[in-house]
Design a protein with these regions (language model features):
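A mobile, often basic/glycine-rich helix-loop segment
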Residues: 1-12
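Adenosyl-5′-phosphate
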Residues: 21-236
Length: 236
């Protein structure tokens, strides 16, 4: 896709900036032609690149089989929606994956933990069907990633709210993992797990923790390994 000289320059730039960005790690992975998935969406929504999984799995054959099954599943999904535009394909994948397995699950878990009933009116099937019928070029506008939603609220909310930049919401996991929780997480991650020894490489886990401490990867990667090991110790 890219001329070799341009590819090298982009890779070098990404490498120089990569120390604290998983997104750039994935970009580097993509540019080097190491991603063979059904759609680039799955690369940027995944926690680990295939190369990283190779260092975490203790059984290369098992990893190969799992990657193959996942590729078949995702390719069938992409093929079933081949009539969609690029924008609508991303919307569909977000709705059927990240929103479904992460956002809605987290919303339900956290709201129920505090006795709250949460509703999601923007997921009404009639509204979703309407949105998929609208041409893609109307859904993206320079300087306004969600122009239809923004315009629909122009006369209902103060201007400073409608025009303000997107505000993310991220819990301070990194701060916790480098502070009060470090001892607990380090104990779990650096202790071999008999229940996972046939699947997970302890050396790979330790390297991932070291990368986090050196700010070469985000908190979400070692955190996911910590949760996996805690779950295995409790349930297997």
């Amino acid at each position: 896709i890219f001329p070799i000289d341009l590819r090298k320059k982009i890779i070098q730039l990404a490498t120089n900036l990569m120390s604290s960005s998983d997104k750039l790690t994935k970009l580097n992975h993509l540019i080097q032609g190491q991603y063979n998935g059904a759609h680039v969406y799955f690369l940027f929504r995944s926690l680990f690149c295939e190369q990283e999984l190779g260092s975490l799995f203790s059984d290369p054959l098992l990893l190969k089989n799992e990657i193959s099954k996942n590729l078949q599943r995702t390719q069938e999904l992409i093929d079933s929606q081949s009539q969609l535009s690029t924008v609508d394909t991303i919307s569909y994948l977000e709705m059927s994956h990240y929103m479904n397995t992460t956002l809605l699950r987290d919303t339900d878990t956290m709201s129920m933990a505090h006795g709250l009933e949460v509703r999601v009116p923007l997921l009404d099937h009639k509204l979703i069907e309407l949105m998929f019928s609208i041409p893609s070029n109307m859904k993206i506008k320079k300087g306004s990633p969600k122009p239809l939603l923004t315009n629909s609220l122009t006369n209902k909310l103060p201007k400073f709210i409608v025009q303000r930049k997107k505000m993310g919401f991220t819990l301070p996991f990194e701060h916790w993992m480098r502070g009060k929780m470090r001892s607990e997480i380090e104990t779990v991650l650096l202790s071999p797990s008999d229940k996972l020894s046939n699947f997970i490489s302890q050396d790979g886990v330790q390297k991932m923790w070291s990368n986090f401490l050196d700010k070469r990867c985000s908190w979400s990667r070692p955190w996911s390994l910590y949760v996996l090991k805690k779950w295995a110790d409790k349930n297997l």
